Curated annotation (Swiss-Prot):
Keywords: Hydrolase, Lipid degradation, Lipid metabolism, Magnesium, Metal-binding, Secreted, Signal, Virulence. This is Sphingomyelinase D. GO terms for biological process: lipid catabolic process. It comes from Uncinocarpus reesii (strain UAMH 1704). SUPFAM superfamilies: PLC-like phosphodiesterases (SSF51695).
Length: 349
């Protein structure tokens, strides 16, 4: 019995390297190096197809049916109606999308039905529009995330575009839990400097860099330049991720007929995921949105030995080192049991 337990735990520990749900995202090995390893030493890296401008219940269901496993939602605080709305262009009194509550409840219901909803990326358009005690405050939207999304196991990414000095950013920064992360937009050196200067206490695995352009081919480059070009900046961000200075790196926005750029982003820049969809339109079912999703999904399928589409089993903000130490403590526990000792961890990882 003890021997079988020991073997089982050893196999579980090996999953930190071999199994998708436990695999470190990219801690030191590039795909071209991993290919040289025997299969039992390889790990596969999870990839995220992030649907762009999902602001309606219908958009959520369409994106899920297209294979999206993560979702970018534009969020506007409505100081007149005292709430948050999914809306790209913030204008009080005009609601382009559904309420945040309705959006969140739909995501939670879809996840409960077994659909893949790994994380929801909130892109705040006017994060400081309301003060603390209003229903449209940053505190209110964070609590709504925790009450609805996170209770169903859905992770949250708070996105701040040129809002690092906002009260909202500071509030989120000071109140992150392990199901949440922060994304900052910009070139690699800028993002790293911002995290180290304005959010030094935010764990590295909860630091996300995003970079791109509405017109992705504009200034894209070939991934080998010194700086500035989209692909190069993202590749340098992935280098920081491998060094443990960032948790994830995401690109935006791929659209129809941009499979070549998707190939560069995933294959050369080694990003963790790509926002895809329409350039300037909210998400809905269309041949172009389906094609943009398929560019990412088919790329991963063709390289399934090294990559896979992230599932609900993945925690994108996981601290892999903490997990490894927890498994190691259980391994030690089994050894102590074999010597008639009893010292096993009581808390979860």
């Amino acid at each position: 019995m003890l021997l079988s337990s020991l073997i089982s735990l050893a196999l579980l520990s090996s999953q930190v390297v071999a199994d998708p749900a436990w695999a470190p995202p990219d801690k030191g090995l590039k795909p071209e190096v991993a290919r040289l390893l025997p299969p039992f030493l390889r790990y596969r890296r999870p990839i995220y197809a992030i649907a762009h401008r999902v602001v309606t219940v219908g958009g959520i269901k369409d994106a899920i049916s297209h294979g999206a496993n993560a979702f970018e939602v534009d969020m506007c605080a409505d100081s007149i109606g005292e709430g948050w709305w999914a809306n790209h262009d913030c204008t009080n009194g005009r609601k382009a999308g559904d309420s945040a509550r309705k959006i969140f409840e739909t995501f939670a219901a879809e996840r409960k039905r077994g659909k893949t909803v790994t994380f929801v990326w909130l892109d705040f358009k006017n994060p400081d529009a309301c003060v603390k005690n209003q229903g449209c405050s940053i505190e209110a939207i964070q609590q709504l995330c925790r009450d609805i999304l996170e209770k169903q196991g859905i992770r949250v990414l708070y996105g701040f575009y040129k809002a690092e000095d906002s009260r909202a950013f500071k509030t989120i920064r000071n109140n992150l839990n392990d199901r949440e992360a922060i994304s900052l937009n910009g070139a690699t050196t800028k993002v790293l400097k911002l995290f180290e200067g304005t959010a030094p206490k935010v764990s590295k695995h909860q630091r996300v860099m995003d970079y791109g352009d509405t017109y992705l081919d504009k200034g894209f480059g070939d991934c080998t330049e010194k700086d500035w070009y989209t692909c190069t900046e993202l590749r340098q961000g992935a280098d920081l991720r491998r060094k443990g200075k960032l948790g994830k790196v995401f690109a935006w926005t791929s659209t129809v007929n941009q499979g070549r750029l998707v190939d560069q982003l995933l294959g050369k820049a080694h990003v963790d995921g790509i926002i895809y969809g329409f350039k300037l339109t909210d998400y809905y079912d269309h041949a172009d949105s389906r094609a943009a999703a398929n560019d990412i999904i088919s790329w991963v399928k063709r390289r399934r030995a090294l990559y896979y589409m992230a599932t609900n089993d993945n925690n994108p903000w996981i601290d892999i080192h903490k997990l490894f130490l927890y498994l190691l403590s259980w391994f030690s526990c089994i050894l102590l049991l074999m010597m008639n000792e009893w010292t096993c961890p009581q808390d979860g990882a």
